[in-house]
Amino acid sequence: MYCVQCEQTMRTPVGNGCAYAQGMCGKTAETSDLQDLLVAVLEGLSAWALAARSVDIIDHDIDSFAPRAFFSTLTNVNFDSERIVGYAKEAIYLRESLKSRTLAKNAAIQVAHPKAEIQLEGNDLASLQKQAQRFALNNDKAQVGDDLHGLRMLCLYGLKGAAAYMEHAHVLGQYDDEIYAEYHRYMAWLGTDPADMNELLDNAMGIGQMNFRIMALLDKGETQAYGDPTPVSVNVRPVAGKAILISGHDLKDLQMLLEQTEGKGINVYTHGEMLPAHGYPELKKYKHLVGNYGSGWQNQQSEFAKFPGPVLMTSNCIIDPNVGNYGDRIWTRSIVGWPGVKHIKGDDFSEMIEQALSLEGFPYSEIEHLITVGFGRQTLLNAADTVIDLVSQKKLRHVFLVGGCDGSRGERSYYTDLARAIPQDCLIMTLACGKYRFNKLDFGTLEGLPRLLDVGQCNDAYSAIMLAVNLAEKLGCGVNDLPLSLILSWFEQKAIVILLTLLSLGVKNIYTGPTAPAFLTDNLLAILNEKFGMRAITTPEQDLQEILSA
C-alpha cells in the first residue's frame, strides 16, 4: 500500500504516505492496491478512447464510465474491494470492445501505451492485489526523485477531483465532448509516467483550466434543473417525526428522494455538502425538506449514531459506520461503497423509505436555530454593484473567502478563530464543508448585507470566481487587485483541483492549510510561492495583519 492523496495521510521522518495494512481513512491495503490497478486500467482505456477518436469513434458510455470509475478512488468514497475490481473488469470489457471497433475502421492503428493492454491476472482478490503492486504509485519514486513524483501526484489527484465534478455534471445530463477528450488526453498521458518537470507543471495548470469549464458545466446543470439558488433560512435542529438524512453532493438523488417520500410523513434532512440544496427553488419547494443535521463529515460516526433514521450517502465522504453501530441504517449510491453496507443500484429508494417508517424518528422538535444559505452565482452577481458602492464609500474594507474541506486535525480551529477575528467592516464568503467550522455563529450584517455569505458546495467556487471576475471588470482592474483574499482549507482531491483552477486563472496570494499536501516537497512549495504567492496559514492574527495592511 502507498497512498498520499489526502490531508490526514501518515507523515513520518522516513517518508510520507499510508503504507501499512490500513490507511488513516480506514481504507485497507487491499482496497488501496486494487484502486491503483483500477487507475492503471483506466489510463489504458483513455489511451484507446483517444485512438478511437482519431477515426471518429466517440463512445459516450466510455466517456461517462471512465471518470465515474476514477471517482471511486477518491478519499472516503469506495472502500469495497469487490466493487473496485468490478470497475476494473468493466473498464477492460469496454476497452476491448472499443479496440475491436477502432481496428475495424483502421487496422493500422497502434496504441503504444504501457497500460493499453492490461488484463486481470486471476479472479481472487489476493492474486489481483499482487498484480496491483506492479502499479503502485511510488514504484519509481526513488529513481525519479521526490520533486518529480510530487508533481505527478499533483496532476493525478487534480485529475481525480476533475473526474468527480465530471460525474456530478453528467448525472445532471451535461456533456461536452471537448472536455471528455481533454480528460482522456490527461489520463492517458499520466499513464506514461511523465518525467518532464515543466510539462508536469504546465499540465497541472491545464487540468485546472479544464476543471473551470467542468464547474461551469456543473453550474449550468444544477441551475437548469433546480433554478438559481436564493438566500433562505435553514433550521439546523431536529423536527418531530420520521426522518431520513442525505449526505454527499448529488442534488438529483435528493430530488428523487424528496419525490419518493412526499406525503409519507417522513422529514428529509441534508448533511454536509448537501446543505446548499435548500437554496434551490425546485428543491426547497418540498415542505418535508425540513432542515440540516450535523456538522463536518469527520463527525459523522457520533452524529449518525444519534440520527433516528436511515442515512443515504450519495458521494464522498463516508467513513466506517461500524464504529457508531449504524451500519444497518446507512445506504450507499453510485460510486460510494463500504463492505456490508446496503447499496442502492437503481433509482428506487422504497426499501430505505420503509426502513425510515419502521424507525422511531425524532420524538420532539427542538427550538429552531436558523442559518442562511443560498448565495449562489446569480445572487452574488446581483449584489456586485452594492459591493462596489460599499467599497467606494469605505464602508466595506475587505472580502474574505474562507472555505474548503473540513477534517479532524486540531489545527483546523484556525478557521473558526479567523472568522471570528475578521473585522466588522469585512464580508466573509464561505463554501464547502469547511464552513461548518463557523457557519452557526452570528456574524451580523454590514449595511444590510449578511456578513457571512454561504456560496454553496465546493464546486461553487465557480460562483465566487465569477463574482471576482465581474467585480474586476466593473472596477477596471485585475482580480488580484481586488480587496479580496482567499484562505482555503484542503482535505482531498476536489480541493486540489479547485486550487489548480484558481492558480491556472492567475489568482495569487492564496493562503492554504491546515498543512501542505504531503506529496508537495519544499522545493515544489517554493515554486508555487514564487509563481503564485501561495503560502501556508500561520496564525489568524498574523495573517489578518498581513492581509489588511497590504
Swiss-Prot record:
GO terms for cellular component: cytoplasm. Its cofactor is [2Fe-2S] cluster; hybrid [4Fe-2O-2S] cluster. GO terms for biological process: response to hydrogen peroxide. Its EC number is 1.7.99.1. One of its GO terms (molecular function) is 2 iron, 2 sulfur cluster binding. Its main location: cytoplasm. It catalyses: A + NH4(+) + H2O = hydroxylamine + AH2 + H(+). The keyword Glycosyltransferase does not apply. It is found in: Cytoplasm. This is Hydroxylamine reductase. It comes from Proteus mirabilis (strain HI4320). The gene is hcp.
